[in-house]
Amino acid sequence: VSLAIQLPPRDDQQEFNLRAWERLLADADLAKIPGSFETDRHGHIIMTPPPGYQHGGRQFEIGYLLRKILGGNVRTECPLSTLDGVKAVDVVWLSDFRESSALKGNVLIQAPEICVEVLSPTNTPAEMEEKKSLYFDAGAGADEVWFCEENGTMRFHSPSGPIQTSQLCPDFPPSIDL
């Protein structure tokens, strides 16, 4: 049995994502609900509870270290338009050059150079593989996707596969200790 999913052309999906995201941001009732929001490729809202204490701490520490080591632009819970809707990336790093072309309104339409996901107990390997693929594919595509395991261990990926250390930020530590 094979399954084929018909996705709309990239530009159409991008415009659809931006409209869906603007509607989501304009909803006063949703603004009162704590947590993180994403959309799927059909514009449906996907809600997740606020991150736990350790998760938030690791997000902050990763962002702090990226800013300290690389400078540039760091954001957390950053909306990124992908072929599967708007995803909230835990931590992103963008150069000034990438930011100037990637930002459209309140959403990135091109992936930042570095996208980081801090893993939670509910994340599945399949879900993380899917996000990694989406980030490498979004707009100009991420240069690297990082994962921070629940124990703080960092895993780094380039579009061609796992890498021992980040090529963009080789001084980044192999583990985030809180």
PLM ranges: what are they?
Residues 1-178:
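Gly/Pro/Ser/Thr-rich low-complexity, intrinsically disordered segments predominantly at protein N-termini
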